[in-house]
Amino acid sequence: MYAIIETGGKQYRVQEGDTLFVEKLDANQGDIVTIDSVLAVSKDGNLTVGAPMVAGAKVEAKVLEQGKAKKIIIFKYKPKKDYRRKQGHRQPYTKLVIEKINA
């Protein structure tokens, strides 16, 4: 059994027990979050596709950690003009483990 969910503007194919990194969610470590935006569910070989969401389907996930990804460096410059800008960015993420798929 698997489901296709949407969170943070991205879509993920998940099964029970999967671990995934998603865009930061407003939840504490150890909390259970419910994801209602389920686009499709496959159960016993039958695929149910929503229009746009599957009615009554939910995915429950546990928050393992909140963190920041590796730092990326943004460096802009204009040659011969003495213009240089260096900026760093670390994208926040939430690490989830899928507990249950209700369909």
Swiss-Prot record:
The keyword RNA-binding is assigned to this record: yes
An example Gene Ontology biological process: translation
HAMAP family: Ribosomal_bL21
PANTHER family in the record: 50S RIBOSOMAL PROTEIN L21, LARGE RIBOSOMAL SUBUNIT PROTEIN BL21M
GO MF, one annotated term: rRNA binding
Pfam families, A to Z: Ribosomal_L21p (PF00829)
InterPro entries the record matches: bL21-like, bL21-like_sf, Ribosomal_bL21, Ribosomal_bL21_CS
Function comment: This protein binds to 23S rRNA in the presence of protein L20.
Organism: Alkaliphilus oremlandii (strain OhILAs) (Clostridium oremlandii (strain OhILAs))
Known partners and oligomeric status: Part of the 50S ribosomal subunit. Contacts protein L20.
Protein keywords: Ribonucleoprotein, Ribosomal protein, RNA-binding, rRNA-binding
Annotated family: Belongs to the bacterial ribosomal protein bL21 family.
GO cellular component, one term: cytoplasm
The protein's name in its UniProt record: Large ribosomal subunit protein bL21
